[in-house]
């Protein structure tokens, strides 16, 4: 049975790999900073915005909150009203990108934010995944899954081979014998990187 799960896991990774083969086509440039008095200038701010395809006002709002200072955009440049190191800027930009831009499943930057009621969803154009946006704190509080443990997941799509797929805590979980829209309790059988194979323990319909 272990060999069967290993084969399923390799097949699952091949499926994800083929569906996201172009995720590296978008490259985010490193912030180019200069000093003007006490201010820090990101000379290529608009270049970064053009790549990540986000509202610059939202990025500025995030950086203002994180850096605790006044920030304004001037043309293609961003003016930060205090001295900030390149390392600090990279850390904050990576935090923004990993929360609001990068797909939680395949890592693609080709995403957009959509509203569903009061919930903001990160929608991936590369793999089709849709996830409520999580803060870094929320990720840390519930990161990871473990082999042998049980989790309740919702099947978000069904692959061409009939296997259900669920997105959970940054993992793509393949669950054979499930249908799109089902909520099931599963046991994790095998994990490799950010892909897992699971089997159904119970279904919501089983409790009715």
Curated annotation (Swiss-Prot):
The keyword Cell division does not apply. It comes from the Archaea. One of its GO terms (molecular function) is translation initiation factor activity. The keyword Iron-sulfur does not apply. Residues 144-202 form the TRAM domain. Keywords: Initiation factor, Protein biosynthesis. Pfam families: eIF-5_eIF-2B, TRAM. SUPFAM superfamilies: Nucleic acid-binding proteins, Translation initiation factor 2 beta, aIF2beta, N-terminal domain, Zinc-binding domain of translation initiation factor 2 beta. Belongs to the eIF-2-beta/eIF-5 family. HAMAP family: eIF_2_beta. Heterotrimer composed of an alpha, a beta and a gamma chain. eIF-2 functions in the early steps of protein synthesis by forming a ternary complex with GTP and initiator tRNA. This is Translation initiation factor 2 subunit beta. It comes from Thermoplasma volcanium (strain ATCC 51530 / DSM 4299 / JCM 9571 / NBRC 15438 / GSS1).
């Amino acid at each position: 049975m272990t060999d069967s799960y290993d084969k399923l896991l390799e097949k699952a990774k091949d499926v994800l790999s083929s569906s996201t083969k172009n995720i590296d086509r978008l490259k985010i440039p490193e912030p180019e900073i200069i000093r003007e008095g006490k201010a820090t200038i990101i000379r290529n701010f608009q270049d970064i915005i053009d790549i990540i395809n986000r509202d610059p006002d939202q990025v500025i709002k995030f950086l203002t909150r994180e850096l605790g200072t006044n920030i304004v955009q001037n043309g293609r440049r961003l003016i930060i009203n205090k001295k900030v190191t390149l390392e600090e800027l990279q850390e904050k930009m990576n935090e923004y990108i990993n929360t609001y831009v990068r797909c939680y499943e395949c890592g693609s930057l080709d995403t957009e934010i959509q509203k569903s009621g009061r919930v903001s969803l990160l929608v991936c154009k590369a793999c089709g995944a849709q996830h409520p946006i999580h803060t870094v704190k929320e990720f840390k509080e519930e990161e990871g899954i473990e082999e042998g443990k049980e989790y309740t997941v919702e099947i978000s799509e069904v692959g061409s081979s009939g296997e259900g797929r669920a997105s959970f805590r940054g993992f793509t979980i393949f669950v054979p014998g499930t249908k799109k829209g089902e909520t099931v309790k599963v046991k994790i059988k095998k994990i490799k990187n950010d892909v897992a194979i699971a089997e159904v323990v119970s279904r919501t319909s089983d409790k009715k």
